[in-house]
Amino acid sequence: MAISFLCVFLITFVSLIFFAKKIKRSKWNLPPSPPKFPVIGNLHQIGELPHRSLQHLAERYGPVMLLHFGFVPITVVSSREAAEEVLRTHDLDCCSRPKLVGTRLLSRDFKDIGFTPYGNEWKARRKFALRELFCLKKVQSFRHIREEECNFLVKQLSESAVDRSPVDLSKSLFWLTASILFRVALGQNFHESDFIDKEKIEELVFEAETALASFTCSDFFPVAGLGWLVDWFSGQHKRLNDVFYKLDALFQHVIDDHLNPGRSKEHEDIIDSMLDVIHKQGEDSSLELTIDHIKGFLANIFLAGIDTGAITMIWAVTELVKNPKLIKKVQGDIREQLGSNKERITEEDIEKVPYLKMVIKETFRLHPAAPLILPRETMAHIKVQGYDIPPKRRILVNVSAIGRDPKLWTNPKEFDPERFMDSFVDYRGQHYELLPFGSGRRICPGMPMGIAAVELGLLNLLYFFDWKLPDGMTHKDIDTEEAGTLTIVKKVPLKLVPVRVQ
């Protein structure tokens, strides 16, 4: 009798909780949502280019909408006003990260900055990174590396210009940014290292981004064992683990090299700075770092830092070459400001060419390398544009859609750098119509390092060379078709003929 009474009581109690939650949710003003299928939710509405699919859905259902990816509800934000509420007004309440299978693995169980959920450990790591790794003084200390690598690229392109052979700029600029980053972060020089192979690094970046972007069933169907089983059969587990072991081998090699007492070094790189903290941890316990933390940091740099700068430069050159009058104007302004007899470009020259800075802003607007800010997760109940967003809800900000919003930009699909003339709009996270690096507590800490490489790289390309199309091509043949998921590249590699300007 007592057991029967207890069972009835428990069933009644659980039912009351369930209905109380249902009544509470019914009072919420949830964002509009497209019709969904059972189980899969709205997954069938997401195509090969997720940012474009989400943009088209937002045009129909509004700038704040609720989607369901499997069993997981996701709020998608596609307007400046809504982005400002998420990234500034409610920044503290929604600056955590969801714990995803791929990010957990590659960050070594969240021992990084980019993927780690919000908390005291994350705050200590980010503070260290901003103070020791990405501060202005540190960025400037790597200036000679950026200038040397750009000069090396100019020499390579000049050799190709002799016989007027087409150059795959997509590869050349990837190797430029990779060379800079490997010297800055890992102390490894592509031109001298026997261990680092450029082609293999490019393949590994592609593999890592593809594995992270591939559908991981466990992230959207968190049913005990079911998602894991599907991922095992689909090969997603193997893809992620293959990337993990390749990255681990690379990082372990360079860390071992740094621990070698006889190692000669040209400068103190990021690994040196982190190893120094590990050696001094007995004196200062405010930050705890291990070798796994170094590898987690390096994974962030590897995934976010290598190809994004190259992608930005490729899109900028693509848009300029498509418009002969525009590239002539940009190059004319650069050469007039710098003179015609420079043998080498330095970073001091960048401040003399404001038109180039407008070109970069316009590239960020029309072609952000990462069109969707890494997903945030709410830690409290918030309201965005009057809609309720409960705790533990993932939020995606579609910066690509905001950059093409006709309410914000005149002729948004046109590449027009002069729209930024006499404009205060900047890309450093304070203007929510232009967010290539995000904003708030989760803004990309490597932004100054990335911007420095993009500005100097583009300045060298546009000062020293005119750019011609391969035989048989016209400007109308240059397409801007996109490819990718985490980062968006030009689908057809950009091949041009460099003509050295004397």
UniProtKB/Swiss-Prot annotation:
**Positions with a binding annotation for heme:** 444
- Keyword annotations of the record: Heme, Iron, Membrane, Metal-binding, Monooxygenase, Oxidoreductase, Transmembrane, Transmembrane helix
Q: What is its main location?
A: membrane
Task: Tell me which SUPFAM superfamilies the record gives.
Answer: Cytochrome P450 (SSF48264)
Which cofactor does this sequence's record say it needs?
A: heme
Q: Which gene encodes it?
A: CYP71B19
Species name for this entry? Arabidopsis thaliana (Mouse-ear cress)
Q: Which family does it belong to?
A: Belongs to the cytochrome P450 family.
Q: Which Gene Ontology MF annotations are present?
A: heme binding; iron ion binding; monooxygenase activity; oxidoreductase activity, acting on paired donors, with incorporation or reduction of molecular oxygen
Record protein name field: Cytochrome P450 71B19
Bilayer-crossing regions: 1-21
CDD domains hit by this protein: CYP71-like (cd11072)
Which compartments does it reside in?
Membrane
Task: Enumerate the Pfam families for this protein.
Answer: p450
Q: What EC designation does it have?
A: 1.14.-.-
The lineage's top-level taxon is Eukaryota
Q: Give the UniProt entry's GO cellular component terms.
A: membrane
